[in-house]
Every structure is written in structure tokens, then in C-alpha cells.
């Protein structure tokens, strides 16, 4: 009972009702959320798409959008090649939640705990495959960031590596597609990736792989991003 009340209080602070907490604890207690890799496609040098079940991705989106409803904050960004973190909405306009910081301390049936575990599992499989193809050295990631782009949300052309963030590999997982806009465009490769639930794209973090997110015209775009650095 004590664990139930701890979970209830923690999740209610996120704007989730007691009924939703009860449903989470009883309905989802033994339900592991899995995103197995169904298909792998190389679309350009070192740019690889991984397809996972759309239904599982949509369930993950529902977990995140509910459980993190009170936790979103304006997204910050490193200026490319610098050590400066900025909240400049002219460059990037979206909300984020760093799931890595606390989901492992959540109650086992907390929706964010389930989401974090599912993300870790699929990313481990994806990166094992990608590293076998392209990366010689060991890599690791300590960040799992949830992103929410509302109408008008965007991210100008950029690359992910910076002096104080020496990233080697970038990963984006799309959770839904019921919105207009929000495409991922690689400027130098002239490749547009149209989001679909469960699609994961992996690519190097440096300059040749500059990319942008086109403005959201309608709806809300949910995604997960991770960055990996050499150990």
C-alpha cells in the first residue's frame, strides 16, 4: 500500500488522475512494452532506418504524453561547435523532458518507468546493429530526451556535435504521425524523412549530417532523441 501511495503522489504531481494511476498499476503491472526491430534500411552513407511496431510506438506516445504532462520545459540547444547552451526559440521551438534523470527511481508500474525501459531495450538493439556496421570504438549514452513539438515548433538546420557535447552518433525515434509538418530534412544529403510511429533513424552527429525539423502546421509531434559519444 505504501508503494501505491508513493506512486500515486508522484504521478499526480504530473497532472495524472488517481483513476489513471490505478489503471496503470493494475492494467500495466505485468505488461512489458516491447519495440522489436522489424526492418532495417540504409538510406545514405551511415544513415539507417529501423522500423518497429507502430502500435507499440503509439502506446509509448500515450504513456509519455500523459505521465509527463506537467514536466515539459522549453528545450535548450548547444550552438553548433560551441559550448554555449541557449533557449533561443528562433533556432529551436519545442518542449523537452530528460527521462534519463529519474525514471529508474520511479515505482515499477509508473508509466515513465515502463516508457524508459522500453526505450532502453530498443535502443540497445538498434545501436548494437549500427555499431556493428559503422562504429569501431565503444560508444555510450547517458541521455534519453523526450521532445514535444506543438504548432509552430521547429528546429533550424544544425548538427549535433559541440565542443562541450562531443557527440558521435544521433538517434531519433518517432512516436506518432497525426500532425502536419515536422519532417526531418538532411540539408547536405537532400534527404527528407517523413515521420511514422515506431520509425527510428540513426546518423552521425557531425557537420555533413546537418538536419532540421520543419515547422509543425497542425497537431503535436512526439519523439525521442539520444546522442552517443565514444567511451
Per-region residue spans from a language model:
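Conserved, well-structured core segments
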Residues: 49, 145, 169, 173
Amino acid at each position: 500500500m505504501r508503494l501505491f501511495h508513493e506512486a500515486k503522489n508522484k504521478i499526480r504531481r504530473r497532472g495524472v488522475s488517481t483513476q489513471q494511476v490505478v489503471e496503470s498499476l493494475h492494467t500495466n503491472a505485468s505488461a512489458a512494452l516491447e519495440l522489436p526491430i522489424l526492418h532495417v534500411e540504409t538510406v545514405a552513407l551511415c544513415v539507417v532506418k529501423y522500423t518497429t511496431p507502430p502500435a507499440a510506438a503509439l502506446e509509448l506516445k500515450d504513456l509519455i504524453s500523459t505521465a509527463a504532462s506537467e514536466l515539459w520545459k522549453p528545450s535548450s540547444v548547444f550552438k553548433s561547435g560551441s559550448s554555449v547552451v541557449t533557449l533561443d526559440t528562433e533556432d529551436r521551438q519545442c518542449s523537452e523532458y530528460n527521462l534519463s534523470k529519474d525514471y529508474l527511481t520511479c515505482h515499477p508500474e509508473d508509466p515513465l518507468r515502463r516508457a524508459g525501459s522500453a526505450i532502453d531495450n530498443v535502443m540497445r538493439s538498434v545501436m548494437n546493429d549500427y555499431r556493428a556496421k559503422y562504429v569501431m570504438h565503444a560508444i555510450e549514452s547517458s541521455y534519453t530526451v523526450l521532445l514535444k513539438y506543438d504548432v509552430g515548433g521547429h528546429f533550424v538546420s544544425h548538427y549535433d556535435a559541440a565542443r562541450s557535447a562531443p557527440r558521435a552518433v544521433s538517434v531519433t525515434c518517432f512516436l506518432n504521425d497525426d500532425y502536419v509538418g515536422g519532417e526531418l530534412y538532411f540539408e547536405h544529403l537532400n534527404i527528407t524523412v517523413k515521420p511514422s510511429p515506431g520509425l527510428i533513424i540513426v546518423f552521425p552527429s557531425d557537420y555533413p549530417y546537418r538536419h532540421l525539423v520543419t515547422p509543425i502546421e497542425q497537431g503535436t509531434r512526439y519523439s525521442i532523441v539520444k546522442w552517443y559519444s565514444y567511451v
